[in-house]
């Protein structure tokens, strides 16, 4: 039996921990060393009182047969131990429970793990421990009389601090016994040890460039501010002042811009008819909002004294997929350069010389493009870089069993196969690849790139424009060859798209052509389309039959006690604790990515999706989710992050949540944390900051068909039984709409009507007109919310439809408030005189009465936001009140470290969660399998970015990009038939090839 030594350090440093462990360690001191041998009592060595290490601790650390167990020991404790005490524990003797937890889809925080495994943990003590760490492990505030708290200045707190250190050992020891070890096999353990070597090695950084770039940005911002003032006659002080700039452009040039998005500005700049002064002003605005100063600042504060940046990747940091997550510098989210490599190289030299303005017109663009160039090769070495080619596309075809495509990849790699783009067209049109013309190949290229992740017409349109494909010529060339049946289906979809205003401005001919090509591409990939549904079926079977493995092509799914495991071909598993089926939905326990609470989640199997047409905020502006491409940058509410693009998840049942169609289990960020879309009616969306220069798009107001009897009730605003009627008495009236439930309720006293409407209804305007001229009345608003009038006025206003309206109060969760939109509002459309919905009364002195007075709004600009709100304590929040329906649904893959992105809703920007991807996990295993051989061959890995390896190697011909690519694309025994290819280059400064 393995002997264990459980260890934990408490440290002090005047360098903040957010600068990274290695920078923190340069000034670190060890305060306490807590330890326990196997199940022996915990001991605490107070290093501040006695510098001599206890004899038993020294013996344990010197014994090579004893395994030391730490929580975050790899990335923190052992680094400090080596730096401060010069004790270099071999990584083979280090076990990290944090990494073990992450590898199995569990949170890394020790406190959360205690909650999950029901380990006895005193919450009050844990809270006190954090306060003690803040007091004793960090410098005191500058205005404090005591600059550092110690055992001498805070003796009582110090003793409690020692007790707290011992309690962490007890918790860690219990957690170690509970954690599964499926994913900590020999290969994964060796891979983690290599990961620690890479993190400790770090990468050489051009600190001079980072400092020069920050200086250049600061100077350029001042210059742009001066230019803005000159161009606007001091009406606008800085081009980053969006509202002031929009107002000035409208007044000075008579041009109203819908927003300040980069795509909007670029279109205007390219317009030859705009005045030169406006063109210059818009260019200044673009430059002012393009920079990456935060990355440069993170680099400078975290780089070690020797010029290397360390500790930038967390092993298994990406939940469940096992991919690495960025830390400190976040190298996975470096902006894609917009300048060519030669321009960047010259610009870097100019930045370092302090004269970038002499060769570059846009300093901000240069500094953003030069950010990757901060990673350099040290003297005598070069950077050798290689990237797996289209690994996720290959992996998807291989996992799904799309054999014809797997063979096509393999033959193409061997130089024997047909061009993949010709093959894509030929496969769709049932032609021979050699018969595909140059023009048809271009169509095939757009099909492969635009539809590879399930994109539709909009994706096809985006890639067609990107590759200069003339859509009229496309329609002329392709339409005659499209089978009639496919064409008929495309025509039906076009007619539906016209009704929903989602034709993207395309003519019928072009739309039908693009949609037909989409259908033909999907018909050519039947295994890929069915793959996700087969996985879901296997998961449901496994949950219902514990201990039995269910095969799903190259995957297997099984339930071991409370754990659901999707076993990848590599032998690693994607782990889902406490998986079960609830109302047909697959659920499991997981960490809420926002609140960090452990709770039941409903995201699995491609079901968490958004309806086609949902607008996603990308760095180029708002874009329908189906056309978001691989390597695009999306806003996650905090920063721009890279995504692997959208994935089509079939036709699924969607509901309306916050005015957007999505599956009921899709995760949305509310004021109370992450909730499923089906719960959205009970919560307001979380506030979300949009990046400077980006504005919520305008939503077209449509008529609202309520599809059921409308109940119109009135109530008065008072706080007692006795109502004193005075001239100041105000009455509020709400339009109430029952939510579709199955409750059997009494017949309401409201007449059924066939879509009567309030016409010309506008908020903040005193008049509105009924469908009946003789009943036109004036209505007044109660402040910014509600309708101020009496029941009789509403009866008169509604003419013959309002005679049976009672005047009592109702409150029920099944009813919905309806804030009146600025255009037409249909009151109802029913098919029968009976109703499913009941009413109930509430006394005027109800303590809950005032909670529902008026119609509250989180946004004063009522004319821009038509909402259906739930009436929970009077708060406004668009709900899932609309009936369910079937729609094409999509999700985004791998959206940065927070796994989320921002979409547009009528209520404002909304943060949603992105889907997990089995292909990512399997692709990660390909990269991981080949990392140890690459390291052994002399290519010292300094960084991995998605499917790319950056290594340092001697500057000799022996080490080449071809050699590295060959090692990276080597097939493992578990993926011997997976076609792999890698390409790379050699450089002295990192760049995007």
Swiss-Prot record:
One of its GO terms (molecular function) is DNA binding. One of its GO terms (biological process) is viral DNA genome replication. The keyword Metal-binding does not apply. Its EC number is 2.7.7.7, 3.1.11.-. It comes from the Viruses. It holds the Pfam family DNA_pol_A. Transmembrane segments: none annotated. InterPro entries: DNA-dir_DNA_pol_A_palm_dom (IPR001098), DNA/RNA_pol_sf (IPR043502), DNA_polymerase_A (IPR002298), Hint_dom_sf (IPR036844), Intein_C (IPR030934), Intein_N (IPR006141), RNaseH-like_sf (IPR012337). It catalyses: DNA(n) + a 2'-deoxyribonucleoside 5'-triphosphate = DNA(n+1) + diphosphate. PROSITE patterns: INTEIN_C_TER, INTEIN_N_TER. Keywords: DNA replication, DNA-directed DNA polymerase, Hydrolase, Nucleotidyltransferase, Transferase, Viral DNA replication. Replicates viral genomic DNA. This polymerase possesses two enzymatic activities: DNA synthesis (polymerase) and an exonucleolytic activity that degrades single-stranded DNA in the 3'-5' direction. PANTHER family: DNA POLYMERASE I (PTHR10133), DNA POLYMERASE NU (PTHR10133:SF27). Belongs to the DNA polymerase type-A family. This is Probable DNA polymerase. The lineage of its organism: Viruses, Duplodnaviria, Heunggongvirae, Uroviricota, Caudoviricetes.
């Amino acid at each position: 039996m393995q002997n264990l030594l459980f260890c934990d350090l408490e440290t002090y440093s005047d360098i903040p921990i957010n600068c990274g462990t290695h920078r923190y360690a340069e000034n670190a001191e060890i305060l306490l060393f807590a330890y326990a041998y196997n199940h022996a009592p915990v001991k605490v060595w107070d290093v501040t009182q006695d510098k001599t290490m206890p004899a038993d601790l020294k013996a344990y650390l010197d014994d090579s047969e004893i395994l030391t167990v730490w929580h975050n020991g790899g990335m923190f404790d052992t680094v400090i131990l080596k730096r401060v005490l010069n004790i270099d524990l071999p990584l083979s003797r280090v076990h990290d429970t944090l990494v073990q937890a992450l590898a199995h889809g569990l949170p890394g925080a020790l406190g959360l793990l205690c909650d999950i495994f029901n380990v006895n943990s005193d919450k009050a003590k844990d809270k006190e421990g954090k306060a003690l760490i803040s007091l004793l492990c960090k410098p005191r505030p500058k205005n404090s009389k005591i600059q550092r708290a110690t055992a001498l200045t805070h003796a009582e707190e110090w003793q409690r601090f020692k007790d707290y250190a011992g309690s962490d050992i007890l918790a860690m020891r219990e957690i170690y016994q509970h954690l599964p070890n499926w994913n900590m096999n020999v290969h994964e353990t060796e891979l983690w040890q290599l990961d620690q070597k890479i993190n400790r090695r770090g990468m050489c950084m051009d600190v001079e460039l980072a400092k020069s770039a920050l200086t250049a940005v600061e100077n350029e911002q001042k210059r742009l501010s001066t230019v803005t003032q000159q161009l606007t006659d001091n009406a606008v002080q800085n081009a980053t002042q969006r509202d002031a700039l929009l107002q000035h452009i409208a007044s000075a040039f008579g041009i109203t811009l819908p927003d300040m998005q980069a795509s909007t500005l670029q279109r205007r700049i390219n317009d030859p008819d705009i005045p030169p002064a406006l063109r210059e002003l818009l260019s200044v605005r673009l430059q002012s909002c393009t920079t990456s100063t935060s990355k440069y600042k993170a680099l400078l504060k975290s780089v070690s004294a020797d010029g290397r940046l360390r500790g930038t990747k967390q092993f298994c940091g990406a939940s469940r997929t096992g991919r690495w997550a960025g830390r400190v510098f976040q190298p996975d989210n470096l902006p894609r350069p917009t300048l060519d490599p030669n321009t960047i190289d010259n610009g870097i030299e100019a930045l370092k010389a302090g004269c970038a303005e002499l060769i570059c017109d846009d300093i901000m663009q240069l500094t953003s493009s030069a950010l990757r160039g901060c990673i350099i090769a040290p003297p005598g070495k070069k950077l050798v870089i290689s990237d797996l080619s289209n690994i996720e596309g290959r992996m998807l075809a291989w996992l799904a069993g799309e054999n014809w495509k797997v063979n096509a990849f393999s033959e193409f790699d061997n130089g024997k196969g047909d061009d993949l783009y010709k093959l894509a067209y030929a496969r769709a049109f049932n032609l021979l690849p050699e018969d595909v013309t140059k023009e048809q190949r271009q169509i095939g290229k757009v099909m492969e790139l635009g539809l590879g992740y399930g994109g539709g017409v909009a994706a096809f349109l985006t890639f067609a424009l990107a590759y200069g494909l003339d859509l009229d010529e496309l329609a002329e060339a392709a339409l005659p060859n499209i089978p009639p049946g496919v064409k008929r289906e495309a025509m039906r979809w076009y007619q539906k798209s016209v009704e929903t205003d989602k034709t993207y401005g395309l003519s019928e001919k072009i739309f039908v052509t693009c949609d037909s090509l989409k259908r033909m591409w999907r018909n050519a990939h039947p295994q890929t389309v069915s793959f996700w549904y087969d996985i879901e079926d296997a998961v449901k079977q496994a949950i219902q039959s514990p201990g039995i493995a269910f095969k799903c092509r190259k995957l297997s799914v099984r339930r071991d006690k409370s754990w659901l495991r999707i076993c990848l071909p590599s032998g690693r598993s994607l782990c889902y604790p406490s998986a079960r089926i609830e109302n047909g939905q697959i659920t499991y326990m997981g960490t809420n990515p926002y609140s960090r609470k452990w709770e039941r989640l409903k995201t699995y199997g491609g079901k968490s999706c958004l309806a086609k047409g949902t607008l996603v905020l990308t760095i180029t502006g708002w874009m329908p989710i189906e056309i978001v491409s691989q390597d695009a940058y999306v806003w996650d509410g905090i920063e721009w992050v890279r995504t692997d693009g959208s994935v089509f998840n079939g036709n699924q049942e969607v509901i309306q949540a916050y005015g957007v169609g999505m599956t009921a289990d899709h995760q949305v960020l509310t004021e109370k944390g992450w909730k499923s879309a089906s719960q959205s009616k009970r919560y307001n969306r979380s506030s979300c900051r949009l990046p400077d220069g980006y504005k919520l798009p305008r939503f077209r107001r449509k008529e609202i068909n309520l599809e059921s009897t409308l109940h119109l009730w009135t109530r008065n605003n008072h706080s007692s039984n006795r109502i004193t009627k005075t001239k100041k008495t105000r009455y509020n009236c709400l339009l109430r709409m029952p939510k579709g439930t199955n409750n059997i309720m009494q017949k309401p006293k409201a007449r059924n009507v066939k879509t009567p409407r309030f016409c010309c209804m506008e908020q903040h305007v005193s008049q509105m007109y009924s469908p009946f001229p003789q009943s036109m009345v004036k209505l007044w608003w109660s402040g910014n919310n509600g309708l101020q009038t009496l029941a009789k006025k509403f009866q008169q206003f509604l003419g013959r439809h309002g005679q049976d309206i009672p005047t009592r109060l109702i409150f029920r969760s099944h009813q919905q408030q309806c804030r009146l939109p600025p255009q037409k509002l249909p009151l109802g459309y029913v098919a029968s005189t009976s109703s499913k919905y009941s009413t109930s009364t509430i006394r005027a002195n109800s303590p809950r009465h005032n909670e529902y007075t008026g119609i509250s709004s989180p946004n004063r600009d009522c004319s821009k936001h038509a909402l259906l709100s739930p009436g929970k304590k009077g708060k406004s929040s668009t709900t899932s009140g609309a009936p369910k329906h079937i729609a094409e649904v999509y999700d985004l893959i791998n959206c940065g470290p927070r796994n989320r992105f921002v979409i547009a809703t009528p209520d404002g920007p909304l943060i949603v969660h992105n889907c997990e991807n089995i292909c990512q996990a399997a692709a990660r295993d390909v990269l991981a399998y080949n990392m140890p051989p690459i390291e052994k061959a002399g290519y010292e890995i300094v960084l991995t970015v998605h499917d790319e390896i950056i290594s340092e190697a001697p500057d000799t011909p022996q080490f080449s990009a071809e050699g590295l690519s060959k090692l990276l694309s080597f097939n493992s025994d578990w993926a011997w038939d997976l076609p792999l290819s890698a390409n790379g280059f050699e450089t002295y400064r990192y760049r995007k090839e």
